[in-house]
Amino acid sequence: MRTVTQRVQHASVTIDGQLKSKIGKGLLVLVGIEDKDTQEDIEWLAKKITNLRIFDDENGVMNRSVIEAGGEIMVVSQFTLHASTKKGNRPSYLKASKPDIAIPMYKAFCEEVGLQLGKPVQTGTFGADMKIELLNDGPVTIIIDSQNKE
């Protein structure tokens, strides 16, 4: 499971011209799922993301988590995070899970993030053509891969 987590002032998802969801201050998490991902990956990533100390404390030091900052989280599926650009100029997405595997994993991840956060997360729609609008704060952007725990 690979995520790109961005600290945002606000973010929203629009599908077919209709607002699907939005958040204020918090995290926008783009998540890509591959076949070898497990429930353990879901739990590890959800805990890691909700406890990342990337929000400023009273001294302006990044020392607070999204939970401590009272922030929100939006999770959006993005299979292109598993693109391979090794050969040629056209990315290959063979490592990305097919929907029959990825959809249940995505739903489980959203649910686990919500449990860790203590409130439901906002989401996009799996597989939809979405317009994501965000105001990146910092910018702070963190890439995490559960298959490569650095």
Swiss-Prot record:
Compartments reported by the entry: Cytoplasm
Annotated motif Gly-cisPro motif, important for rejection of L-amino acids, positions: 138-139
Highest taxon, organism lineage: Bacteria
SUPFAM superfamilies hit by this protein: DTD-like
E.C. numbers: 3.1.1.96
Pfam family, one: Tyr_Deacylase
GO BP field: D-amino acid catabolic process
InterPro entries according to UniProt: Daa-tRNA_deacyls_DTD (IPR003732), DTD-like_sf (IPR023509)
GO cellular component: cytoplasm
Keywords associated with the record: Cytoplasm, Hydrolase, RNA-binding, tRNA-binding
Cytoplasm listed as a keyword: yes
Catalysed transformations (reactions): glycyl-tRNA(Ala) + H2O = tRNA(Ala) + glycine + H(+); a D-aminoacyl-tRNA + H2O = a tRNA + a D-alpha-amino acid + H(+)
Gene Ontology MF, one: Gly-tRNA(Ala) deacylase activity
Cited function: An aminoacyl-tRNA editing enzyme that deacylates mischarged D-aminoacyl-tRNAs. Also deacylates mischarged glycyl-tRNA(Ala), protecting cells against glycine mischarging by AlaRS. Acts via tRNA-based rather than protein-based catalysis; rejects L-amino acids rather than detecting D-amino acids in the active site. By recycling D-aminoacyl-tRNA to D-amino acids and free tRNA molecules, this enzyme counteracts the toxicity associated with the formation of D-aminoacyl-tRNA entities in vivo and helps enforce protein L-homochirality.
Description of its domains: A Gly-cisPro motif from one monomer fits into the active site of the other monomer to allow specific chiral rejection of L-amino acids.
Family note: Belongs to the DTD family.
Record note on quaternary structure: Homodimer.
Protein's name in the database: D-aminoacyl-tRNA deacylase
Source species of the chain: Parabacteroides distasonis (strain ATCC 8503 / DSM 20701 / CIP 104284 / JCM 5825 / NCTC 11152)
Gene giving rise to this polypeptide: dtd
